[in-house]
Amino acid sequence: MKNNSVKIVVATGIGAALFVIIGWLINIPTPIPNTSIQLQYAVLALFSALFGPLAGFLIGFIGHALKDSFLYGAPWWTWVLGSGLIGLFLAFGVKRETLTQGIFGNKEIIRFNIVQFLANVVVWGIIAPIGDVLVYSEPANKVFTQGIVAGLVNALTIAVAGTLLLKLYAATRTKSGSLDKE
């Protein structure tokens, strides 16, 4: 258990740092204010798949809080929580044992993308906007529009870049029974 907790702490630190750096360097605006294409969610997908839901939550939560603090002066806590929840849910879209055995085929890709799409719809389309209305007294039509756009953009980003990262990672793993004795 101790070895696992050390891995989670290290993965959280590295993952959160990557979340901040990628979010800072690659921020593609959309027509909706304060909403952009965020490639760090693809990296969050990989880390969540490899290190589990706790690491995924912490990477998303800490990474988003730090990114907001550095870029905007203060975190927007309802969306910080949303990033943590996305990291948590992404871990349930991939069977870690299968991925580390080098298996990430069509069945795994479909499962991963169903889970990540549903997570994005629920987190960004429902939870974060309701939080914005309750915590920050934001206008509902504004935050639900932002949430829906963010959810769809993040789902597309994860579907393309996250799936690609997971597929590339699986390709680096040796499949059991793949070595033949000469």
UniProtKB/Swiss-Prot annotation:
Name assigned to this protein: UPF0397 protein YdcD
Main location: membrane
Residue spans crossing the bilayer: 8-28, 42-62, 74-94, 114-134, 146-166
Gene that this sequence comes from: ydcD
Location within or outside the cell: Cell membrane
Keyword Flavoprotein assigned: no
InterPro entries reported for this sequence: ECF_substrate-spec-like, UPF0397
Lineage, opening ranks: Bacteria, Bacillati, Bacillota, Bacilli, Lactobacillales
Xref: Gene3D superfamilies: 1.10.1760.20
Keywords: Cell membrane, Membrane, Transmembrane, Transmembrane helix
GO CC annotation, single: plasma membrane
Membrane topology of the entry: Multi-pass membrane protein
Family, per entry: Belongs to the UPF0397 family.
